[in-house]
Curated annotation (Swiss-Prot):
Name of the coding gene: rapA
Upper taxonomic lineage: Bacteria, Pseudomonadati, Pseudomonadota, Gammaproteobacteria, Enterobacterales
Domain Helicase ATP-binding intervals: 164-334
Motif (DEAH box): 280-283
Family statement: Belongs to the SNF2/RAD54 helicase family. RapA subfamily.
Name listed for the protein in its UniProt record: RNA polymerase-associated protein RapA
CDD domains, per database record: DEXDc_RapA, SF2_C_SNF
Organism per entry: Shigella sonnei (strain Ss046)
Oligomer and partners: Interacts with the RNAP. Has a higher affinity for the core RNAP than for the holoenzyme. Its ATPase activity is stimulated by binding to RNAP.
Gene Ontology biological process terms from the UniProt entry: regulation of DNA-templated transcription
Cited SMART domains: DEXDc (SM00487), HELICc (SM00490)
Its EC number(s): 3.6.4.-
Protein keywords: Activator, ATP-binding, DNA-binding, Helicase, Hydrolase, Nucleotide-binding, Transcription, Transcription regulation
Length: 968
């Protein structure tokens, strides 16, 4: 095409320069000025990498003064174009705009505009864009979205609770699973779902001070949720940035003490507009009708301001009725306002729980029990179902399940309370205790005698704590560098045990970090034993590395030496041997230690080794734990209660371990108390609540569905393709792990989630569980979600041109591949993507408008095509521009019909599901007072807004590919 002064062109290789103007032409060269950047470019006339910018009727263009017009006619005179049309601001018609006055900052956003302007993408980027659209749409439709991305084992009862609660509007529930069943993980799963779906954006977690870092680590490692830890220092810093310091972060963790200490701070917390509040260890909030504690009042105040509340607490039976009522009162003060009425309700509920237990056991029910069930369910025509459940017919089992299901819906607290017990959940290992009695060295005997004389004024509790750790008494007199490990028989025993069990992974726990560090040095120097150390003085990254080294099968550490605090919240169920180098002071800490290995998913029985020194507090405590509480070989829900009741006597025995008179009687009394309390707890088991909480077959099916999704090879192929195109280096490390590092030529300079040093990833859940240094990649991982956003939010891959070698078609045959997107715009919290995520519709049109997409599958077709360089591509586009315009118009006529079908299907699905949910909740509201009015209002409002948004749904062209047939 000849060049003329004043014409507008765009650079094929530097599209960021904007619209250029021809300012000089001679026999061999042409000069373009790019006004938006003030730069000039000199090109050879014969083969310049520039494309003529020409708009067509129907296009909207912008003048250099900023006003816009819709083009109705294009005139050409002496090689220059004049556009005639209607101004959009004044609606004046017949306005003429010469091309020289076009806005130079022109950005081509529509795929067809980019194609005609010579902004042609690489072919592989077009393919990636289509795959990103397709997979993104599929993921939104998954029924368990938000439950696949966490680094956890797929445990049915946890998935069941998270699936139920995570989809609710502003859930307010009590999670009261027994220890070791994963309340923290359940809460994390609920948060993950709510944040991913947009149902929540701001979350506050309040925990005891000692658990802050544990929660911080768990949320980051398991759920990729980056919380900010607020303490006095962070709060003071944030006051410089905002009136309310908590507005500076979306996800916050703080301690209960931090929240309670200052009135202004509590007010700031209440005003920060959180969507969800999580409170761990909620059973420590003391309440009575006359005198609630300050901690309880602080949480009560917060719970009034925050729509969603998750309380994590010990099991209700351990708490007592009043304490249990106090938790429920925080969730719904209107429903739980009268303690006496609550006690009466619970009494009335007892026969129902008994009847359910009989139904589940398959026993026949008496007429009285049948009548009571009929009244409890309160449905008309329930009689045939009751009779079927009580018969010997084939339908009896399904009738019983249906009755149990109906009772669950109506059960007093089943919507607000979830509680699983070890009895109701299978999959726990056995625990076997091995005690090793060792003589007390003379060095320790001397130190203990001197300590007894010098510490005569110490309290019994202080003396008891000293007597648990004789090595520390010895160091008090001999100095911190005293080499107690040279004569302590526990060290000799440990070295002998480890050298004779070289193939076993062994977790060693001791009370203090200093002990762990000293043991590591001794094991390494004396026996060459590879030991990792894990204590509270290490950073999260250092702990991750230590845990990863311990997890490595062949070259990893044989031993992990943990301090008490350092091991909080970490689980090592790939190991099954534990050594307690010393014993903790109370049964809760003992259970916490064993809980590092005793988790669901532990494949082997747990071997607990306790080497203890005779005539020390250790010898007293090992007997009390084992013979009095059976706390080593079984979980001990009664431990704290009995510990509190015999505290003074126990302390005296620990402080003077050689004075054992009456100790056998104490153990006998504790054992009797333990058995009685245990029987009482078992009798009080709420079978109906347990079934509701663990989900039964439904939960099992959910876990299996997610496990199948874990094997999806599409994710791996897509991720590798995505990393290639973004410019991320991939280095296969073996063992299903890959190291990702940034390259020098990235699509964006800083890709979110990829550090300068790189990261290790795995697509294998088992590897991710064993290797804490490897990130678990799923469709829900931020790395993939950020990659999808990067590709789909910009114009990467939105226009390209390819050659098809096919001798069956005439040379020059044109095909246009169009990727339309059908979508609706709505606030994220409406979760419209459940019904109509941005959905790609692919068309492959010839110039007669025939759609060949159904016959020609995308991936197969893509492999047959060849790339074209940008310069040649621009020339091809210019030659067939009018034909492409005509095909686009044919495509628009067809997409109208396809889009309407998709939108109508989405409307029908949304109407059916949301109306059914509303009807069910309204029906249950009549028989279950735990369904809150605001829940019903929210469901109705949500339904209306979803339907309105779907009414406004439309379509747009997202990407196009021009295909030209060649025989060469």
């Amino acid at each position: 095409m000849p060049f003329t002064l004043g014409q507008r062109w765009i650079s094929d290789t530097e599209s960021e320069l904007g619209l250029g103007t021809v300012v000089a032409v001679d026999a061999r060269t042409v000069t373009l000025l790019f006004p938006s950047t003030g730069e000039n470019r000199l090109y050879a006339r014969s083969d310049s990498p520039v494309t003529r910018v020409m708009f067509n009727p129907g296009d909207t263009i912008t003048s250099h003064d900023g006003w816009q017009m819709q083009v109705e006619e294009v005139k050409e005179e002496n090689g220059l174009l004049t556009y005639i049309g209607t101004r959009l601001d004044t609606e004046e018609s017949g306005v003429a705009l010469r091309e020289v006055f076009l806005d130079s900052k022109l950005v081509f956003s529509k795929p067809q505009d980019r194609l005609f302007a010579g902004q042609i993408d690489r072919m592989d980027r077009f393919a990636l864009r289509y795959r990103a659209r397709k997979y993104s749409s599929e993921q939104f439709r998954m029924p368990y979205s938000g439950l696949r991305g966490q680094r956890t084992s797929l445990i049915p009862h946890q998935l069941n609770i998270a699936h139920d609660v995570g989809r609710r509007h502003a859930p307010r529930v009590l999670l009261a699973d027994e220890v070791g069943l994963g309340k923290t993980i359940e809460a994390g799963m609920i948060l993950h779902q709510q944040l991913l779906s947009g149902a929540a954006e701001r979350v506050l977690i309040i925990v005891p001070e000692t658990l802050q870092h544990q929660w911080l680590v768990e949320m980051l490692r398991r759920f990729n949720l980056r919380f900010a830890l607020f303490d006095d220092e962070r709060y003071a810093e944030a006051q410089h940035d905002a009136y309310n310091p908590f507005d500076t972060e979306q996800l916050v963790i703080c301690s209960l003490d931090f929240a309670r200490r200052s009135k202004q701070r509590l007010e700031h917390l209440c005003e920060a507009e959180w969507d969800l509040l999580v409170v761990d260890e909620a059973h420590h909030l003391v309440w009575s009708e006359d005198a609630p504690s300050r901690e309880y009042q602080a949480i009560e105040q917060l719970a009034e301001h925050v729509p969603g509340v998750l309380l994590l607490t010990a099991t209700p039976e351990q708490l007592g009725m009043e304490s249990h009522f106090a938790r429920l009162r925080l969730l719904d003060p209107n429903r739980f306002h009268d303690f006496a009425q609550f006690v009466e309700e619970q009494k009335n509920y007892r026969p129902v729980a008994d009847a359910v237990a009989m139904l589940l056991a398959g026993n026949k029910l008496s007429n009285d029990e049948l009548n009571m069930l009929g009244e409890m369910i309160g449905e008309q025509d329930i009689e045939p179902l009751l009779q079927a459940a009580n018969s010997d017919s084939e339908d009896a089992q399904s009738a019983r399940q249906e009755l149990v299901s109906m009772l669950m819906d109506r059960h007093g607290t089943s919507r607000v309370l979830f509680r699983n017990t070890r009895n109701g959940v299978k999959g726990f290992p056995k625990r076997e205790l091995h005690t090793i009695k060792l003589p007390l060295p003379t060095q320790y005997q001397t130190a203990i005698k001197v300590s007894g004389i010098m510490g005569a004024r110490k309290s019994a509790e202080d003396r008891a704590r000293d007597m648990l750790y004789p090595e520390r008494i010895y160091q008090e007199f001999e100095g911190d560098n005293a080499t107690w490990w040279n004569f302590d028989p526990r060290v000799e025993w440990l070295m002998g045990y480890l050298t004779s069990h070289r193939s076993q992974k062994v977790l060693v726990i001791c009370a203090k970090a200093a002990t762990a560090l000293q043991l590591e040095q001794v094991l390494r120097e004396r026996e060459g034993i590879r030991a990792a150390v894990f204590h509270e003085g290490m950073s999260i990254i250092e702990r991750d590395r230590a845990a990863a080294w311990f997890a490595e099968e062949d070259t990893g550490a044989q031993v992990l030496l943990c301090s008490e605090i350092g091991s909080e919240g970490r689980n090592f169920q790939f190991a099954s041997h534990m050594v307690m180098f010393d014993l903790p002071f109370n049964p809760d800490l003992l259970e916490q230690r064993i809980g590092r290995l005793d988790r669901i998913g532990q494949a082997h029985d747990i071997q607990i080794h306790v080497p203890y020194l005779e005539k020390t507090a250790q010898s007293v405590l090992v007997r009390w734990y084992h013979e009095g509480l059976d706390a080593f070989e079984h979980t001990c829900p009664t431990g704290r209660t009995i510990y509190d009741s015999v505290y003074n006597d126990l302390i005296n025995y620990l402080a003077s371990p050689v004075q054992t008179e009456g100790f056998d009687d104490l153990i006998k009394n504790c054992r009797e108390q333990h058995e009685a309390l245990k029987a009482q707890l078992e009798q009080g088991r709420d079978r109906l609540l347990e079934i509701h909480s663990n989900g039964g077959e439904k939960a099992q099916a959910l876990a299996e569905s997610i496990e199948e999704q874990d094997d999806d090879t599409n994710l791996i192929a897509f991720a590798m393709n995505l990393f290639d195109i973004i410019g991320i280096n991939q280095d296969d490390r073996g063992d299903n792990m890959i190291v990702l590092t940034p390259s020098d030529h990235m699509l964006v300079p800083d890709f979110p989630g990829l550090s300068e040093d790189g990261i290790t990833i795995t697509f294998d859940r088992e590897v991710a569980l064993a290797r804490e240094d490897a990130q678990f990649i799923t469709w829900e991982h931020p790395l993939i979600r950020n990659g999808l956003d990067l590709i789909l939010s910009g114009d990467t891959g939105s226009s390209t041109i390819s050659l098809l070698k096919n001798k069956a078609l005439p040379v020059g045959t044109l095909l246009v591949e169009l990727i339309y997107v059908v979508e609706a715009q709505a606030p994220k919290q409406l979760q419209l993507n459940r019904f109509l995520p941005p959905t790609p519709v692919r068309m492959l049109l010839d110039k007669n408008g025939n759609n060949l997409a159904a016959q020609v599958e995308f991936e197969t077709f893509n492999r047959q095509l060849n790339a074209v360089n940008r310069h040649t591509g621009s020339k091809l586009v210019n030659a067939v521009q009018q034909d492409v315009h005509a095909i686009l118009q044919l495509g628009e006529a067809q997409i109208e019909k396809s889009a309407r079908a998709l939108i109508d299907a989405a409307r029908n699905e949304a109407d059916e599901k949301l109306s059914a949910e509303l009807s069910r909740m309204e029906a249950l509201r009549a028989v279950n007072p735990n369904i809150r009015d605001d829940e019903l209002t929210a469901i109705e409002s949500n339904r209306q807004q979803v339907m309105e948004s779907l009414d406004q749904a439309g379509w747009r062209l997202d990407a196009l590919r021009l295909i030209v047939v060649t025989h060469q």
